[in-house]
């Protein structure tokens, strides 16, 4: 039944789902297919409301709609049946479908529809059915569970099934586990059983062997003779006797144990027991005891005999049998004992034989096992060889991969380093570029400020900032209240200091801005004050005396010191080993030294003299200060608890790993090397690297142990600059010496240079004589480590099965592996540190030598040896030269010790003081604080003088030196000075220099910044005045109002003369008003200019600038005063005179008072003068100012000129005042010198007369001298002051000493020649000091005067330049004002002319007239009244061209043909009649073009024949397509591309598209033509024919009956496949139908019949020759193309399949169409080729007409003939007929309508 229903549903009804018997209930459970079945029988009208879903709501909906229909058919259906079907109850759906099948078959027989059946039902039944349906729906809703409940139930069921499945899996797992356990137990039980079986079998075999070894001896028969019986009795008695003896032994043993408690039982041996018991008993010695035993034995024997008697009597028979048994047993025992020995021997023999057999088996087994061992060894050896080969191969692969990985890592690191270098270089370049841009923008800004004339000084400052790398623009403005300093502020301070230093250098050297002006070009700048420089240098050297140089008693060493550096594996150690073998040098490797130090600590190496920590460890200040304790045992290092180690370390404190050490006797007793090793081991145990300080200490300690004359070389050390510095400091102490050198250089004077070079610190020797770099590339280093590892791997693999390597080789391997792991880091570390190291070794003196280490090892060793030999020879030459210098120094030191004149021996200290008092007058006596040198030199003077000699010496004192002081030949006075004098004068000179430089820099900075202020002020003045001139005015308002009034005049009044006169008057009024505005603005501008000129800025700025230059003059004057005082104190101290009292009232240069306020004198710190010159002479005006003011009269500028002249006078007065003050100072100093000499001159006479009166009159002379000095001091000073206490005290002391000195008894002595020479020398010295002092003052005066004159010239030039710039700006302001006024007046004149022109021409002014500021123009962009609207352009109109039908005509023809024949096929006679009617009845209709109006009936018939399909019908669509030409004929490729676009647009693949889709896809040509828009707006646009043709083609081929119209694009493209060549057209149509290009199989000849027919119809004389030739050329080209295509046919061409329907669509021209009238509602079509095509398909093997390949189809003769003769795809040439008709009409004249009517009839 189910199969029948399935067949009915699937085949007859063809339901949407395939129904199978297995899924029948499930398929119909939702009721959808039941509704579909009813719908197919037109019973379920609401089938669209059915749902295919399986949810509860869908099922309820479906079955609720099914219930009325099933009830109508009489099928039994209620909620129970529905529930059964929904729940997929077996048989429910089948039963319902069977009932439905029967009911539908009945209905089918009746032929009634559902509506008819329903109408046949009574009305009451229908209402009742509606109620039943509603009730059914409610009941069914209650029966069917909700979808959510159903979903929950399904989820529950799913999880229940999952739970059940998990339980089953768990039970299965337990069962499997239990079975596994049972299986294991069973296997164990079987194993135990088998084991027991094997054991039993082995035991049975052993028992069998034993049994087989037993020899069975036959038992002899019992001997029943008396002799045998007696022997048995005897044996029984012996046995009893033995038993008794044994019992007795036991008893005696017990007795002995009781008697001898805790004693050892002595070994006793009893003699062999006799055969009888009596003999045994008699052996005991105790008689009583023996008697008792004998008695007891007798009693026992008697009792036993009685018992035996009774037993014999009672049991005689049993006794006899028992005795017999006993006898038999005894005999057996006896025999057994006798035979036991032989059995044991046989058993031993059997066992021996068994052992021999076992030995033989073991021997055979051993031989077999040895053979197996031999085979195994051979196999293992072969396996080892194979494994070694495999491991070697794998190791090579791994090593190659590792090498490649290491190379990639190295390349990556190199790329990163290159990237870092690039980024650094890029950053530097970017910074430089930014600074260049800043400089350019700064220059551009200041070109705007200065009118492209940037001051030279400003440009120099910017260049200086640019070259120094400082930003040109200001970074921040640091106000006075701001306290915190930022980075930008530091940058600004650095910039300011740089520019200040540059300005000071220019000022000092008189370069740049401070170069000599033209008026001072003839005067040379002052030279350096050599005397002052010498004085300062001597003071500095005395204030910081140089340390005494200790003479080296030892000879300099010939040892060469160097270091060998390079990358890892560059060959340093190898080269040094080879060098050490050939040359006696000591090689020091830091790694070896650290290991030896650690080993020394572990070995507890003791020091021989126990040095202290502070003496030995010099390079480690931390270790010197921190105490440490280290136990001797190395294991105690980790266990020792360091105090405070766990406490957190505070920030800012310097942590040191040696803080935990404390001094201990055990540690201090260690050697220095051991102590350093302890610290190194501690650092290494903590996982840290050994510090550089510790490494250097270890290295220095090792160097100290090397002999002095032995050379040494360091292996790979130092590695960083820090290590190099520490090593240099430890070996040479360069840091301390360099600091001394810097300190001494910092104290050298800068204002006065010494003529002689100061004693510099000698050149600091380096710690090394040479440093060699083994240069090697990174790749070579990596290649060497790879070679080492490769050799190591091969060695390991080859010796893997041999005994393990030694400890040394394992350590080397670990070192190599460690080196390989860190080779990249080492290379990178070397590359990072080497640039600084290279700079360290090459900066002071180049000791670095680079050697290429990638050469051969022997050649490299030879090269290093040559370098070392060269260094040894150089060192030898240096040492010999040094020795020669020392010898020469010793000789030169010995020669000056012998003076040319004899000197008296040195006296004692008391005698020295005495001589000093006698030789020196009280006014110039020396104090006690004179240096020893001074005392020694003063002590050389003798007190013994004669008056005669003194008179002879006096003429020699007047002699003058020939050399000039300060020159190169001048010998400077170096008399001793007091020790405390340099400590006062050196700081005083430093203060002078510091104050002078600071003052000069501050003033120059103010002048520099004021220059920027001037430029900014002048620029702001110019711009503000220009903006003032450009301020807005109200002229445009008046102009706009006038224009509005002018345009508002009516047009009819334009020609009136009175109106014109009125308009001219209005123009005049406007002009006058505008002139008034311009005059007012001019006056305001002039007042603004006067306000700017009358500002006090220029006067204030000139005053400030003058004060700056006066400050410079003050600085020079102050410096001169301070220098004069310093020289005075120095030379007076050298003459042992008392310094003069300090005069604090220095010369002050007054400044200019800027404002006119009067200030009281006590409020002034600096004197001020008014802006009025005190000099009466006139100062001539500068030429620049005079040139600017020449020929012009401007009162404000004249006032500026007068002010400038007064300022010049003030500058000159101030300069003269400063110059005069300096000259007066020098004159006063010279006068003071002369006065002192005059005072000293009279004192020479008393000394020469008699030295005796010196002791008595000494005090009086001292008092007189003091009074004279006091009066002289009062004259020189302005304020009277009392004498200071120190001079009084000194005089009192000298007076006291003079009184208390012992009176020497003097006799008249004549003056010796030596005393005369000493007096001459003293006078010469005084004269030399005076000359030197005055020369220094004069030189300083000249320099100061020159500086003051330079400042004066600079001040005047700057003031002149400033006034010139300001006057120039004021002149420009006047020029701008006048120019603007003239431009405004010219603009007003132009406006007046334009207005008068428009008045005279009587035209309005449409464009806006613009008059603003000084500009006048007519704005063409703005119109005051709108233009008239432009005329509208007419729509485009298509014109007839060359007889072509217009789009409108084509649409009219289409509408007529569509009404006549909607399917496109029309009879040829009807077609001809329609055309004839259109031609003859075209009066006023314009249905055809003019060229068609000349066609005759014959011509129309010829056109019809060209379009005829089957001699009866015409395709009017093809006619319209041809009539619409010209249009681009598509190529085959274009047709296929258009087809693909249509198919892509047709998503549903229905074969039809709408107009929107058609427009979206487009044809092979587009309607976007280049249309030229005509310039004339009244001319219509050109007509776009192609765009309209595309739309017309859609209307032509679309099915207009559908809404919206649908276009069959394949059918349309078949129309366009037509071609002038018939064969080409057919192939094009096939290609369009198939969708791909179809190649021609065979070449078919051209259809000549058609040509002949056409030629016969149209004679040659009717065709133009040009067209005929062009047609032939086109056909020839097409033929060539076709031939070329045929030649290019690929092998697998035309493999596409084509169906019968497609083929019939292509050859559809054979359809027989009946379309007799326009009212036919359908057409009857039949293709005449269908039968032949079906037969062709069957012939080709397609029995069921399935698609076949095109190439197979084209080979069939019928298809070839059909393609050759099918002419429907040829484009008919209608144009030829039209041209012929026009030609004939031109010869015959126009036809009349009557004639046409006759022809029609």
Curated annotation (Swiss-Prot):
Residues 176-260, 321-395, 722-748, 869-895, 1051-1077, 1252-1286, 1665-1695 form a coiled coil. One of its GO terms (biological process) is establishment of localization in cell. SUPFAM superfamilies: P-loop containing nucleoside triphosphate hydrolases. Keywords: Cell projection, Cilium, Coiled coil, Cytoplasm, Differentiation, Flagellum, Golgi apparatus, Spermatogenesis. GO terms for cellular component: cytoplasm; extracellular region; Golgi apparatus; manchette; sperm flagellum; sperm midpiece. Residues 883-892, 909-918, 1233-1250, 1261-1295, 1669-1687 have a biased composition (Basic and acidic residues). It holds the Pfam family SPEF2_C. Transmembrane segments: none annotated. Predominantly expressed in ciliated tissues such as lung, trachea, testis, brain, and at lower levels in kidney and spleen. Residues 632-659, 883-949, 1233-1304, 1651-1695, 1781-1801 are annotated as: Disordered. Residues 1305-1657 are annotated as: Interaction with IFT20. It is found in: Cell projection, Cilium, Flagellum; Cytoplasm; Golgi apparatus. Residues 1-105 form the Calponin-homology (CH) domain. Its main location: other. Interacts (via C-terminus) with IFT20. Interacts with DYNC1I2. Required for correct axoneme development in spermatozoa. Important for normal development of the manchette and sperm head morphology. Essential for male fertility. Plays a role in localization of the intraflagellar transport protein IFT20 to the manchette, suggesting function as an adapter for dynein-mediated protein transport during spermatogenesis. Also plays a role in bone growth where it seems to be required for normal osteoblast differentiation. This is Sperm flagellar protein 2. It comes from Rattus norvegicus.
